[in-house]
Amino acid sequence: MVKNIGVLTSGGDAPGMNAAVRAVVRTALHYDVGVYGIYNGYLGLYRNEIQPMTRRSVADTINRGGTFLGSARFPEFKEEAVREEAIKNLRKHEIDALVVVGGDGSYMGAKKLTEMGFPCIGLPGTIDNDVAGTDYTIGYFTALNTVLDALDRLRDTSSSHKRISVVEIMGRHCGDLTVWSAIGSGAEYAIVPEMPFDEDKFLEQLRDQVGHGKNHAIVCITEKITDVNRLAKRIEQETGLETRATVLGHIQRGGAPTAFDRILASRMGAYAVELLRQGYGGRCVGIQANELVHHDIIDALENMSRPFKDCLLDLAHRLA
């Protein structure tokens, strides 16, 4: 039976991480299991930045964005000697299991610890919604609302000035945030990494629409596909309409989590503790068809893929 649990947040912050940590802490304490907060992710684990948590430690955190535990990039965690030091620090505090909240990079750290014999549970915390084994990640819907708000505002000014707006949206290699926000905002175009981007064909379609009287548009595009400032200049040259590029950037990560993210994170955090009490380790939690599930974390990273819903992209284009 697990006696003490550690919890950390890692990678890019996501709204709802605090709610997940709160659920881990209070569920563990409910079962008289000790719980320790690890500050600044895997870097803090390596540096022994570990403190005991009480119910009061997580009071008034469920509504806060970001992560009060902090996060940090720490690529050195790939080194076995670094992980051995991390496990040594966990043992010093008599912690015998770890809950990690983060994306697939954070899962990789949990996988490595699992392979070294230290039980871990991963919770999907990222606005990108790109983690295998779950329909939705903690923070995704809050980020979606943030993007929608920005697109609505850009629509106002674009229509007023007869302007095209090219909007770069986060997501890394996943186009979910782009597609869902395009549908929700009525954007004319959604360009995602899952589908090849034919720039010339896209410009031809845009020229045709402008030729038929279109005088403003919103173009949503996932980051890293192309230079949006260059694309905006080319659109302006090809269509004759003033075109501006907007990179939403890190504003997408901030803000108070939505009700959905608070509840999802709370369910997942509590479920992680239940799994550890049942003797599970090396698992990652997900939600599928609104039911909590868990998968082998190694299998999730190495063999599971997250299918892209082409039908949603088709819908975005049909409704544009």
UniProtKB/Swiss-Prot annotation:
Its cofactor is Mg(2+). Mg(2+) binds at D104. One of its GO terms (cellular component) is 6-phosphofructokinase complex. ATP binds at G12, R73, F74, G103, D104, G105, S106. Pathway: Carbohydrate degradation; glycolysis; D-glyceraldehyde 3-phosphate and glycerone phosphate from D-glucose: step 3/4. It catalyses: beta-D-fructose 6-phosphate + ATP = beta-D-fructose 1,6-bisphosphate + ADP + H(+). Its main location: cytoplasm. Substrate binds at T126, I127, D128, R163, M170, G171, R172, E223, R244, H250, I251, Q252, R253. Allosterically activated by ADP and other diphosphonucleosides, and allosterically inhibited by phosphoenolpyruvate. Pfam families: PFK. Belongs to the phosphofructokinase type A (PFKA) family. ATP-dependent PFK group I subfamily. Prokaryotic clade 'B1' sub-subfamily. HAMAP family: Phosphofructokinase_I_B1 (MF_00339). Catalyzes the phosphorylation of D-fructose 6-phosphate to fructose 1,6-bisphosphate by ATP, the first committing step of glycolysis. Homotetramer. This is ATP-dependent 6-phosphofructokinase.
